[in-house]
A protein has these predicted regions:
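Residues that define the transmembrane beta-barrel architecture of outer-membrane proteins
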Residues: 31-38, 56-60, 101-109, 154-160, ...
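Flexible, solvent-exposed coil segments and beta strand-coil junctions
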Residues: 13-14, 39-46, 85-95, 135-152, ...
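C-terminal outer-membrane beta-barrel translocator/porin domains of Gram-negative envelope proteins
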Residues: 9-11, 157-322, 357
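Transmembrane beta-strands of outer-membrane beta-barrel proteins
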Residues: 16-20, 49-55, 71-76, 122-132, ...
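Transmembrane beta-strands of outer-membrane beta-barrel pores
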Residues: 22-28, 57-61, 70, 77-83, ...
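Outer-membrane beta-barrel initiation region
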Residues: 1-78, 156-178, 194-196, 295
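Outer-membrane beta-barrel "beta-signal"
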Residues: 335-344, 360-373
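Outer-membrane beta-barrel translocator/channel fold
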Residues: 69, 74-124, 136-148, 239, ...
Length: 373
């Protein structure tokens, strides 16, 4: 528009941000019409250490890495401790007898190496880490739990994880992917100390040990013949649990959150055509392709289409949770905008063909407000 704007630089090595928002579902997912969410994000990068923390109370992810040159000692903690009944859905109907409450807490520590890579911004590095893991799993009946549902015992968890990351991505003003790729993988082995007390039944596998592998690729780039304001964006995710070892308690959680941008958030599997919620899957492969247009220097519009193959949790008989293959698709129209008080807004409208509601298509809307301190 012929005017110049001076935007003060952001110290991306020292960031504190608050995200609050919510989603509305149409139709409902089971009995769920919508839900709020919020999280505090902290990132600090010093010469000899770094930390990255996402805190929401019931679900948290904390990491602190001590570095000496390219070597680092990695410490990591995560928990998923939702104090509400968790039920499976069939044809968008909650199967009440499957109701349980359960959660997991996991701590990890181990060595790693990290090297900076082009374009040498704070996110850009290649790292390989080997972590020992110790944690705890708990599960409890609710007033609605079927008498025949086998509930696993509370148990100690321990194992190891191999984690590799590469991030060569350049981000734009709103931290959205602009140019480059990021990729990585995880190989995770866990032993459930008391799982031999089970005999299969409604929980699936009776084996104590399981191996899971995941991988991802996220990218953004220009479109030949169009301006710098036009971007093509894509992401691909895959995950597999060792054969016969999947159950609802160790299944992957496929999320429908916004298109990934922040470096450590890239690895979390998402089906971008879906709304902001988790779906249990024993194995999955998903790909999303989109177009993003910079409407003004602070406003971006994205159009994204998604495809998903997955072995989704469903119910057999009255209360037996099993996994069945599904192939689904979805689409999202999203707007990212700068806002007052050093903040940004995210608004998205999504539709998908039945993975979220296990047999019934539908859509919804998500709104986020992100405040940078």
């Amino acid at each position: 528009m012929g005017e110049r704007f001076k935007i003060p630089p952001v110290d991306r090595a020292h960031m504190t941000a608050l995200t609050v928002g919510g989603s509305l579902l149409a139709p409902k997912q089971g009995d769920l019409r919508g839900f709020p969410f919020g999280a505090l994000y902290v990132r600090r990068v010093w010469n000899d250490a770094r930390t990255r923390d996402v805190v929401s109370g019931l679900v948290n992810e904390l990491e602190y890495d001590k570095t000496v040159g390219p070597l680092e000692l990695v410490t990591h903690f995560e928990n998923y401790t939702i104090p509400f009944d968790q039920r499976e859905i069939v044809d968008n109907v909650e199967i009440v007898p499957t109701s349980l409450q359960w959660g997991t807490l996991l701590g990890s520590i181990g060595p790693g190496v990290r090297f900076p890579v082009h374009p040498f911004q704070v996110d850009n590095d290649i790292r390989v880490q080997l972590l020992g893991r110790v944690g705890y799993f708990y599960a409890d009946r609710t007033s609605d739990t079927s008498p025949g549902l086998v509930v696993p015992p509370d148990t100690v968890l321990y194992g190891a994880k191999l984690r590799a990351r590469y991030d060569g991505m350049r981000r734009n003003l709103l931290e959205l992917p602009h140019q480059g790729i990021a990729t990585g993988f995880d190989v995770d082995y866990l032993h459930r100390d008391k799982w031999s007390d089970l005999n299969g039944g409604s929980t699936g596998s009776a084996r104590r040990n399981y191996l899971q592998g995941t991988a991802y690729l996220v990218g953004a780039g220009g479109i030949p013949g169009l301006s710098e304001r036009d971007r093509v964006i894509f992401c691909m995710y895959g995950g597999k649990t060792s054969e016969g070892d999947a159950d609802r308690f160790n299944a992957f959680r496929i999320n429908g959150s916004p298109f990934p941008g922040e470096a450590d958030d890239l690895a979390h599997p998402r089906y971008t055509g879906a709304i902001h919620n988790d779906v249990l899957s024993s194995s999955y492969a998903t790909a999303s392709l989109g177009y993003r247009r910079e409407l003004t220097f602070f406003l971006y519009m994205s159009l994204v289409g998604s495809y998903l193959w997955g072995e989704r949790a469903t119910v057999q008989g009255v209360d037996q949770v099993v996994f069945r293959q599904q192939r689904r698709g979805g689409a999202t129209v999203a707007f990212d905008s700068g806002f007052l008080w050093n903040s940004s807004l995210y608004l998205a409208f999504s539709w998908e063909s039945g993975y979220l509601r296990n047999g019934k298509d539908g859509g919804g809307a998500t709104f986020n407000w992100n405040k940078l301190f």
